Amino acid sequence: MYTAGSVIIEDGVWIGDKVTILSNVRIGKNAIIGANAVVTKDIPANCVAGGVPAKIIKTITQ
């Protein structure tokens, strides 16, 4: 039997075009995921991430 894990997307997240988000991943508040990224692990709040696999590019300071 196949079961999928949950994906949690918190408030204020921007997700670019054609992004793939794998199961059991949390994307933190106000994070930005660049177009065509593949998110394989959690992305912390207030970060910009992109690439294959997605990596943190920058931390957003407010």
Regions found by a protein language model. Give the residues of each.
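A glycine/serine/threonine-rich, flexible loop-to-helix segment
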Residues: 62
